[in-house]
Amino acid sequence: MKDGRNSFVATNSSRSTNKHFVLVHGGCLGAWCWYKLTPLLKSAGHRVTVLDLAGSGINSKQVNDLRSFSDYIHPFMEFMEYSVPGGISAKPEEKVILVGHSLGGLVISKAMETFPEKISVAVFVTALMPNITEEIDISDVVNEGSTGDSIYTYDEGVKDKPTTFICGPDYMSSTLYNLSPPEDIALAIMLMRPVRLYSMKDMLKEIAISKQKYGSVKRNFQCSIIEKDPTDEVKEITGSDHMVMISQPQQLFVCLQEIAEKA
């Protein structure tokens, strides 16, 4: 973010010192984007899981294989279902802290609705966060004309809406990584992969949220959304861009540590 501020969301539950963090990347990225934050969390005694969503990072799926949002988030949802304890036998300290960045906010929102009993805290890092009372609108996130040299494909014809998107180098340097080290920008340009642009109809169907489940996991978000949907805690990181885990990993770690201590 060019204004140098980033915000998160948090909820409360168990009170064990060492937590299990699950880090979920945004569109066009992969698990690799957490490489600075992961060792910081581990050095504090936390367990950390980083996942590649389908068609991202080193995941073998290709973007055109992912016909629905469920296909895209399948590796993460499978992990939440089978690798995170749940049910009446689960201990409070086994709950996870979810951290979603950018598009990853919608991914962890799906988990909050599906597995609320497995989550102690949900953290939205410059991320999309659904509002219980309003429809999701991501049209302004990847609108053509607002993303510079980014590339769109039209697999269903140029008269239809674009089907995939990948960040362009200039757009990344000027908007997403504008306060990040140049070597990290170079690395990201090499590792970017296209993300599928799902229709609003598909997104609304896939991320149907309720106050009883999704709403039971306390949350927070960026300034423009907080006004519409007041939430629980906001933390701001100065001197950061959209890629806060790259530009200000130490400050992000401190914020997450504070959240973990309250959880």
Regions found by a protein language model. Give the residues of each.
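Conserved HGGG/HGGXW glycine-rich cap/lid loop of the alpha/beta-hydrolase fold
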Residues: S13-S60, E94, T114, K118
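Catalytic active-site module of serine/aspartate enzymes centered on a nucleophile-bearing elbow/loop
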Residues: F8, K19, P230-A263
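Flexible "cap/lid" loop of the alpha/beta hydrolase fold
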Residues: E113-F165, M200-M203
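Gly/Ala-rich beta-loop-alpha elbow adjacent to hydrolase catalytic centers
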Residues: V99-G104, I108
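Active-site loop/oxyanion-hole signature of alpha/beta-hydrolase fold enzymes
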Residues: R47, G55-I97, K110-K118, I136-S146
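Active-site nucleophile elbow and catalytic-triad environment of alpha/beta-hydrolase enzymes
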Residues: L187-G215
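Short alpha-helix in the alpha/beta-hydrolase fold that links the catalytic acid
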Residues: M203-K205, Q222-I225
